[in-house]
């Protein structure tokens, strides 16, 4: 999903930069507030960031100018919400661009918008809806992680289609082409990623269920019930 350095032409890379900055700034505010009020969650923040880094670094060649890989944002989205997830994603994307030749600086805004903003926001909305409907937490976590990945690639395909419309076919034709290529790798990758994140949540709930209550992810009764039953 990382679009390579210099691949997006102007004005598209500038547009994605401008659109991503306000969300990132709000995420910084939310992160600072959370750490001041609940410093005990710092280990979970670190783990969530590490999950994003490790999974999103497992890249496979895909569409010209981009790659396929898990995004790893599902865990952070559920624990901390999409705004803070955008900050963790930004840190990972910047490190990868500077030291791993994965992504780029001019394309940083586009990559952050897809992996760190729109994907997490859509997934978070689905997660909250499922929890309101009393869907099992582990099922909700699996669906959330899957959608965070898939939506990211829909956005990346849209970004590439807008920058490189097909002739003939225009933006729509280009979008279908990009989505078709991404789907080959991303459908199975997202399912594997979601399975891993769901297993991680099972461990976190057993070891740090109290922190999930502190973060308002689950209630005390939900944690007790999940500990007593198998997912």
Swiss-Prot record:
Keyword Cell membrane found: yes
Top-level lineage group: Archaea
Any GO BP: cobalamin biosynthetic process
Transmembrane segments: 9-29, 41-61, 74-94, 107-127, 135-155, 181-201
Gene3D superfamilies: 1.10.1760.20
Signal peptide location: none
InterPro entries given in the database record: CbiM, CbiM/NikMN
Coiled coil: none
Pathway field: Cofactor biosynthesis; adenosylcobalamin biosynthesis
Keyword flag Transcription: no
Location(s) in or outside the cell: Cell membrane
Topology in the lipid bilayer: Multi-pass membrane protein
Principal subcellular localization: membrane
Keywords, comma-separated and alphabetical: Cell membrane, Cobalamin biosynthesis, Cobalt, Cobalt transport, Ion transport, Membrane, Transmembrane, Transmembrane helix, Transport
One annotated Gene Ontology cellular component of this protein: ATP-binding cassette (ABC) transporter complex
Single Gene Ontology MF annotation: cobalt ion transmembrane transporter activity
Subunit structure as annotated in this protein's UniProt entry: Forms an energy-coupling factor (ECF) transporter complex composed of an ATP-binding protein (A component, CbiO), a transmembrane protein (T component, CbiQ) and 2 possible substrate-capture proteins (S components, CbiM and CbiN) of unknown stoichimetry.
Function comment: Part of the energy-coupling factor (ECF) transporter complex CbiMNOQ involved in cobalt import.
Family assignment from sequence similarity: Belongs to the CbiM family.
Protein name per UniProt: Putative cobalt transport protein CbiM 1
Organism in which the protein naturally occurs: Methanosarcina barkeri (strain Fusaro / DSM 804)
Gene that this polypeptide is encoded by: cbiM1
């Amino acid at each position: 999903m990382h679009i390579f350095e210099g691949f997006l032409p102007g004005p598209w890379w500038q547009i994605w930069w401008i659109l991503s900055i306000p969300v990132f700034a709000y995420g910084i505010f939310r992160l600072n507030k959370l750490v001041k009020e609940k410093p005990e969650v710092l280990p979970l923040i670190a783990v969530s960031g590490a999950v994003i880094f490790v999974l999103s670094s497992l890249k496979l060649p895909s569409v010209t100018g981009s790659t396929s890989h898990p995004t790893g944002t599902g865990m952070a989205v559920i624990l901390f919400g999409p705004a803070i997830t955008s900050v963790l994603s930004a840190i990972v994307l910047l490190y990868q661009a500077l030291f791993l030749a994965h992504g780029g600086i001019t394309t940083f805004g586009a990559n952050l918008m897809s992996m760190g903003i729109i994907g997490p926001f859509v997934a978070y909305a689905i997660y909250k809806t499922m929890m309101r409907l009393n869907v099992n937490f582990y099922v909700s976590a699996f669906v959330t992680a899957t959608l965070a990945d898939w939506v990211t690639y829909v956005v990346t395909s849209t970004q590439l289609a807008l920058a490189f419309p097909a002739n003939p076919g225009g933006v729509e034709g280009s979008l279908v082409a990009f989505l078709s290529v991404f789907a080959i790798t991303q459908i199975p990758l997202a399912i594997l990623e979601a399975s891993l994140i769901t297993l991680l949540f099972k461990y976190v709930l057993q070891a740090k269920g109290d922190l999930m209550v502190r973060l308002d992810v689950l209630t005390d009764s939900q944690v007790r019930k999940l500990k007593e039953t198998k997912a």
